[in-house]
């Protein structure tokens, strides 16, 4: 449906919301860049956790929209429910367990549907409110 890099660029804002409580310093850094160039207007120092993640994610999607880049998986021609199912199945593959464990918010395979499922649904629709934080 799309290249790995393109998929990562679409997914980054959604994972920023999920990981936000664990990566606040990084979000403030990158958020400052988005703010400097007008993609974020909020005072990042007044925000924390999920709220900070949502504001930075909105800055990311504002930039993407400005350059005509997709911000939702549903904007990719040919994207279907099967792609979500395959992604969730791949994330639960025991051979990839170390990838789950090395994320800013470590997961185990039994948590994939509970946490990654809503991230993918949010990325399909563009609705950050669907993301469930740990």
Role assignments for model-derived ranges:
Residues 34-134:
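C-terminal charged capping/lid subdomain of soluble metabolic enzymes
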Residues 1-59:
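Active-site segments that bind and position negatively charged phosphate/pyrophosphate groups
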């Amino acid at each position: 449906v799309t290249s790995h890099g393109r998929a990562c660029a679409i997914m980054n804002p959604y994972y920023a919301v999920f990981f936000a409580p664990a990566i606040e310093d990084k979000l403030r850094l990158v958020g400052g860049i988005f703010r400097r160039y007008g993609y974020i207007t909020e005072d990042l120092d007044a925000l924390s956790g999920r709220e900070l993640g949502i504001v930075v994610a909105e800055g990311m999607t504002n930039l993407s929209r400005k350059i005509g880049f997709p911000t939702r998986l549903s904007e990719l021609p040919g994207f279907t429910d099967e792609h979500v199912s395959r992604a969730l199945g791949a994330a639960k593959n025991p051979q990839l367990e170390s990838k789950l464990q090395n994320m800013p918010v470590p997961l185990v395979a039994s948590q994939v549907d509970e946490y990654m499922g809503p991230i993918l649904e949010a990325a399909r629709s563009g609705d950050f409110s669907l993301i469930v934080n740990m």
